[in-house]
């Protein structure tokens, strides 16, 4: 059996709005005790549903012209990024070549230093031999001329 009950006061109305969390309602609500449900009758300013999600409709539309402009701007941005990446790739290749040339120059310098080191070693040995020869000559001169 259904009984019709008006909103008795503003507090009851606001409690019903809090339960539904959407819109405003003016009118009657009907309590169905058999089904444990509530039905409404009256004026609805917004969509009113209990325990059901309200699906909002997106009212933002994009025209084809705006979509094409967006695609064009994206294409331009991507083209700009591609050219920047290509330029950076060329710079990286040039830097790699420079590093390889410098590596070769360093290897050549190391070979030259090694050769110079061996040459200095040989000169040092020659100087030792000259010193030994001079020492022997000095010893002979001392034997010949003992006047000192």
Curated annotation (Swiss-Prot):
InterPro entries linked to this entry: DUF16
Cystine residue pairs: none
Entry-linked Pfam families: DUF16
Coiled coil: none
Bilayer-spanning residue ranges: none
Family: Belongs to the UPF0134 family.
Record's protein name: UPF0134 protein MPN_204
Organism ancestry: Bacteria, Bacillati, Mycoplasmatota, Mycoplasmoidales, Mycoplasmoidaceae
């Amino acid at each position: 059996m259904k009984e019709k009950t008006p909103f008795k006061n503003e507090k009851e109305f606001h409690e019903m709005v809090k339960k539904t969390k959407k819109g405003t309602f003016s009118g009657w609500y009907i309590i169905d005790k058999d089904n444990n449900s509530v039905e409404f009758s009256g004026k609805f300013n917004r969509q009113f549903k209990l325990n059901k999600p309200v699906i909002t409709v997106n009212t933002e539309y994009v025209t084809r012209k705006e979509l094409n402009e967006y695609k064009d701007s994206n294409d331009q941005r991507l083209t700009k990024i591609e050219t920047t990446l290509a330029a950076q790739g060329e710079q990286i290749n040039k830097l790699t070549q420079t590093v390889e040339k410098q590596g070769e120059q360093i290897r050549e310098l190391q070979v030259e230093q090694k050769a110079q080191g061996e040459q200095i070693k040989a000169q040092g040995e020659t100087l030792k031999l000259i010193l030994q020869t001079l020492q022997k000559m000095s010893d002979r001169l001392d034997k010949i001329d003992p006047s000192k």
